[in-house]
């Protein structure tokens, strides 16, 4: 595989991560005279402040998920690649990704966060994180499934166990 982005005379900024920070930076830099390359493991942006509404069935997942290529479709010097960052070689100004290497003039990491369980194995085992649409959908499905099962319980004790 190859990144397959031709180098031109513009300075190249590679942004790893298309969350709120990476997306905003890419939008701002597209207005400058730069070649902007956004790398993300997904080909869409998820708007994190509304993920809880997916879990509570308040909105549809498509309401907060936006394809990067659609967001930047009118930008000439913008490129998106769905990949994961693997290694950085700062002396050579190269980023190794899951689909190949890319040279950069400037490299920005805006890779976001992960759920912190604070070293508590029980929380890690039993808690349901909610940082992505798929995690929110998992929580939503678990709650709805338990509500459906509660309707068929023979006793109040069974219902309480759910």
Regions picked out by a protein language model, each given a short descriptive name:
Residues 2-79, 160-162:
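Beta1-alpha1 glycine-rich phosphate/pyrophosphate-binding loop at the start
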């Amino acid at each position: 595989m190859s990144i397959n982005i031709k180098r031109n005379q513009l300075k190249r900024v590679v942004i790893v991560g298309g969350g709120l920070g990476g997306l905003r930076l890419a939008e701002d830099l597209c207005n400058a005279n730069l070649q902007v390359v956004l790398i993300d493991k997904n080909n869409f942006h998820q708007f994190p402040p509304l993920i809880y509404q997916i879990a509570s069935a308040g909105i549809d997942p498509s309401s907060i998920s936006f394809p990067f290529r659609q967001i930047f479709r009118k930008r000439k010097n913008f490129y998106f690649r769905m990949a994961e960052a693997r290694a950085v070689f700062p002396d050579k100004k190269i980023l190794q990704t899951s689909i190949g290497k890319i040279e950069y003039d400037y490299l920005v990491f805006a890779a976001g966060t992960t759920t912190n369980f604070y070293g508590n194995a029980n929380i890690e085992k039993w808690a349901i994180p909610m940082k992505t649409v798929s995690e929110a959908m998992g929580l939503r499905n678990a709650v709805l499934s338990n509500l459906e099962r509660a309707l068929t319980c023979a006793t109040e004790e069974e219902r309480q166990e759910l």
